[in-house]
Design a protein with these regions (language model features):
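Proline-rich intrinsically disordered, low-complexity coils
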Residues: 14-15, 32, 65, 87, ...
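Residue-level marker of positions within ordered structural domains that often coincide
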Residues: 29, 36, 67, 116, ...
Length: 142
């Protein structure tokens, strides 16, 4: 998914069209310059639906498929109005690499957070305003 090449981060983001592409472009324009106290980095992504911060990179991909394990029994966390799913194996309290995905939004947004930036709450707080403004909530996280 991610490979560093000098200052540019290579990301495989999904190809999107229509409303999904418009919402994800709006999100990328609204994203902050820093996440978890890490500066934004340039991204090599053909379709333009990804962003990155820091080294090792925190990587955001917009318009991803629903993650495996996210079902009606999965737990989610709400931080500043945005619901997040983190696989149970990654949410035991130990610093591990985390892949967290928004819950209940019209487009799924996935953030890969290296263990260097554990716990994930700082990144969730930093990303919440842009997500709230641009990616429509269709179902609350419960």
């Amino acid at each position: 998914m991610v490979a560093g090449c000098s200052d540019t981060v290579s990301v495989n983001a999904p190809p999107l069209t229509g409303a999904d592409a418009r919402a994800c472009r709006a999100l990328l324009r609204a994203l902050p310059d820093s996440v978890a106290d890490q500066a934004r980095r340039p991204v090599a992504d053909e379709d333009g639906f990804a962003a990155a911060w820091g080294d090792p990179p925190i990587v955001l991909r917009c318009g991803v498929p629903r993650p495996a394990g996210l079902d009606r029994f999965a737990t989610c966390q709400v931080v500043n109005g945005v619901g997040w799913f983190i696989p149970e194996s990654q949410s035991q309290g130990d610093p591990v690499d985390i892949t967290m995905t928004t819950v209940g939004r019209a487009q799924n947004v996935q953030v890969s957070l290296p263990s260097d930036y554990f716990p994930p709450a700082n990144a969730m707080v930093d990303l919440a305003p842009a997500l709230e403004r641009t990616i429509r909530e269709i179902r609350p996280c419960v």
